[in-house]
Every structure is written in C-alpha cells, then in structure tokens.
Amino acid sequence: MKKEKISDVGIISFSLHSDGYNFGAALHSFAFQKYLDKIGVDNVIINYFPKSVWRNCVLNDIFMNIIKFQFISMFKNIIKLFFILIKKKKFHNFFKRNCNITNKQYNVKSLEKLNTISRFVCETDVTWAHLKGGYDRGFLCDLPNMKNKKNVAYSVDFGSKDISFNDAILLKKYAKNFDKISIRNIFKLDYFKNIVDRNDITITIDPVFLIDSTDYVKIAEEIKYEKDYVLVYNCQENNTEMIEKAYKYAKENSLDVKIINCFMNNYQKIEDSYPTLIGIEKVLGLIKNCKFLFTNSYHGICFGIIFEKEFFAFSRKANNEKILTVLRLFNLENRLINDKEIMPCNIDYISAKNFATEIIQKSKLFIEDALKEKILGGG
C-alpha cells in the first residue's frame, strides 16, 4: 500500500461508500473536489467507510435471515448483495478514473492514524444526522488527529427530525471542531443556530451546483436509443404512484420508459429492491438525454436542473425537506407533484437559474473565505 500524500484539505463524506451506493453521494464529492481544484486548493477525498453504512449493510440482513431460519429471504438477500458488490465496483472505478482519493480505505478507528491532512472539510449529505450507531465522529471531526485544524462543514444536513436534548448537547460540542459551518436545509437555519449556539452558520447550495454542466458532460456516457424516453429515477423510497404516472405520461406522448432503481424502503418483495446495475457515468447520460424526468431523488432533481430537463418531482416520507429546499432555491416548487395530476408546462430555466445565482455565488464565496489561506498559499 502506497503512503498517503500530504494534502491541504481532506474531503470527508458519504462519497465512495453510502447506503445502497447512492449515485448522488458520489457525484457531490466529485463536484466538490473539482471546484476546489478550480480555485487552487490542494485536496484529497478520504476513502471513508462510515459505520452507519456498515450497520445498514445487506450482510446484516443475511445474518438475521440465518438466525431466524428465513432461507428464502436469505437467498434473495445474497442475490441483492451480489448486485450491490457489482455496483460498488462501478463506484470504485469511477473514483479511480475521475477523482483524487486516498490510497487506503478508512473506518472511524483507522481514521485516527491519518496524519497527512492539514484540515478537513465535512462535505454535505446527512453527515451530521443521528444515524444507526449514533453520530459519526469522523464526519464531526471529533478524533484526536482532526481537532484544532480550522475544519469546515459545507452544506451539511442533520436530517429532518427534531434533535433530541441529548443529541443537541453532543452537536453543540462537535460544532466546536469546526471553524466554519454551513447547512443545506433552508427551513432549519435558525433552529440549528440555536441548537449549537452559533450565529455564524449560513445556508449553502449542494456541491453539484458549484461546477458547470460541461464538467458533467465530459464524463457522462453517450446514450443512444432509437426512441425518446421518460426516465424514472426511483430513490430511497419505492414510489409506485410515480412509476404509474410516468408510464401513463409516456403512453400519452409516445415515449419509452427507462427506470433507475436506487431505493431501500417501501418495497413489497426483496427482488423489487435490487439496484439497477449501471455506473455513475450512465446515470448522468440517462438524465442528460431523457425527454422527461420523473424522480423522488434529491440529486435526481439537481441534475434535472443542471441539464435543464423537464422534470416532475415527487415527495418522500424521510428527509423531504432537502427536496423542498432545492426546488425553492430555483423557484421551481410548482414541479412537485404529490397528489396533483400531471400538468405539463415548460420550465423557464433562464429565470430559474437567475433566481439561484445569488445562493450559488454565496456558496462559492463561503468556500473561498473558509479556505482562503490555502488559496493564497498560506500555512
């Protein structure tokens, strides 16, 4: 194993490893690194395996199947594991081709031995949420080698649930490990300021909006189908109503339907939850080339906006506020369907992107200010 290179900034998030190997998690870290590269900040993505991902691993489901003598479910979960391992390999290949990532994979224990990073940036996602196993001290820079380094939290999320009294005490303590903090949930800014007792916290936009669509086009797979298609990006919670509406819309408009499955909840049969075996580059290509996009995925919406696609957004039960946040930041709340009938109307992307210009510029300035010593070549 090669030694780790000394880096000014270590990016830590759900990057290479996330529940079900989420495409959005990989792409927000890719985008954040590319933006730091553009502004001249030496950085590396830490290959970090969070404990919550391990707790949600299908291996645990297989173990419980064995204990309960559920052998049919065990067999189906073994097949699911095979699917996930293939997807994991595609993620590894993506990061190897497109990102600067640490040579070694770290967990919260081995992360304590990483001493080649000048400061850490905890980069977006639900990194500050109380997940299975509690808070992740790696994400909260609460390890001895991570403290006192002017760390930055960029557009982090603590989930949509209210924070308990005990968790509030912990978060207030953990927040002291960071010199600068921004969150992505526009509905909880004042609430979070009160929780951690800091007034310097601000809102920033998801990292995928920090770089241009051309940066994604460069890595997107070229998609060639004989017929135009509706893309259904079904994420986290299986939404059968969304699928039905997509097929109805496709039939009415003489379009094919392509589906990306990336969900873990609300499925009737285990085999329904098997992930679509495609790589990150193909996901980008499918979104870029679709005629219409139906999605309950937060990052599905983000890339629908980036590629200026006509899309319809659907709510989720869990952490729906992030979907509402991105729609509001682009003044596109009318794209949320819920129980409404599909009423097609073209999106005015000039207006939508002008509306979001201020928050995008503010987010870039936040990063530049937080890391200005590195940009200027200081210590």
Segments the model singles out, each with a brief description of its role:
Residues V152-G159, F192, N234-C235, T240-G279, ...:
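Catalytic donor nucleotide-activated moiety binding site of glycosyltransferases and closely related
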Residues L286-V326:
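A donor-sugar binding/catalytic signature common to diverse glycosyltransferases
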Residues F178-N185, F294:
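A short beta-strand/loop micro-motif in the catalytic core of glycosyltransferases
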Residues I117, F178, C290:
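An anion/phosphate-binding loop that grips the pyrophosphate of nucleotide cofactors and donors
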Residues S7-K173, E222, I243:
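Aromatic- and Gly/Pro-rich donor/ligand-binding loops
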Residues L329-G379:
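Leloir-type glycosyltransferase catalytic cores
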Residues I201-F209, S213, C262-N265, K269-N296, ...:
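Donor nucleotide-activated moiety binding/catalytic core segment of transferases
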